[in-house]
């Protein structure tokens, strides 16, 4: 099995864990007394220091392979890519806020169906920004996955949360749709940053990009927390000594200890999502990453039904079938495309070589 295939599988696993587990952890936070918006936004990217460990291993491996007189820098990222990572990170910070705001007022299943729209946005932006080519299988997958989202939308009228006003629901819906639009722009922007960086993008470099991106997004959310009054201590970075957060922990319905368990695992799980999403852009393309996100959304819906007793209507079953069909269609198209490319390469290699004398 080729290393690239292994990386695709690993990143798909990370993406599945983060894409399915992240919204559930945030719903657990809001359902049991969590009231902050910027704080869960902050948790989505604050786990970025975890990326330091694979980067350290990569550095040690590079240094071991070099001769004694040669040196290797710890970070391979050059200024253009570093600046691009910061810009993308700022957008991710605001996207996190939009998504957290929406999830505070709408069920996970409803949020998932709205986020499905990001696939269409990703395809549109990828077409103009990185000249992403569409095959019939890709178009079929997009239509099926988008159709699944539409079916869910038509069956979400009874999904309002308890004690929720119509205004809160509408605002939550709009904010989540905005998150889908912005994320649909972010994925091709990352791919464009790779192409315009002037560097050969390796998986190590993709991880460095991810760490800088998440750090910038975390800073945005940290400023938002300060502005929203989420900190009541002199040194804002001491999360666990924060009077606002500590008070929320004491009032958490599952208990103070489980409150901290929830926020720690929320940070870890969301970091898995970002590593998987950015990794898939490196291994394949932004459109592949977007399709995988959309393909996993019905799984999130089913988990929400199981964990939070959200209603599972017939429309959600139809959406799940359409999503699976779309995913199979896309991957089948990828296999056929690779087979066609290999066949063409084989034909070219078998052409007779003749000497031409002028």
Curated annotation (Swiss-Prot):
UniProt entry keywords in alphabetical sequence: Membrane, Transmembrane, Transmembrane helix, Transport
GO biological process: purine nucleobase transport
Cited InterPro entries: PUP_plant
Spans through the membrane: 6-26, 37-57, 74-94, 110-130, 134-154, 170-190, 209-229, 262-282, 288-308, 312-332
UniProt-annotated location(s): Membrane
Tissue/organ expression: Expressed in the vascular system of leaves. Restricted to the phloem. Expressed in flowers and roots and not detected in stems.
Keyword Protease: no
Domain EamA: 46-154
Membrane protein topology class: Multi-pass membrane protein
Main localization category: membrane
UniProt superkingdom: Eukaryota
Activity regulation (record text): Competitive inhibition of adenine transport by isopentenyladenine, kinetin, benzylaminopurine, trans- and cis-zeatin and trans-zeatin riboside.
pH-activity profile: Optimum pH is 3.0.
UniProt-recorded Gene Ontology molecular function terms: purine nucleobase transmembrane transporter activity; purine nucleoside transmembrane transporter activity
Annotated GO CC locations: membrane
PANTHER family named among the record's database cross-references: OS09G0467300 PROTEIN-RELATED, PURINE PERMEASE 2
Function: Mediates adenine transport. May be involved in the uptake of cytokinin analogs.
Family: Belongs to the purine permeases (TC 2.A.7.14) family.
Protein name per UniProt: Purine permease 2
UniProt source species: Arabidopsis thaliana
UniProt lineage: Eukaryota, Viridiplantae, Streptophyta, Embryophyta, Tracheophyta
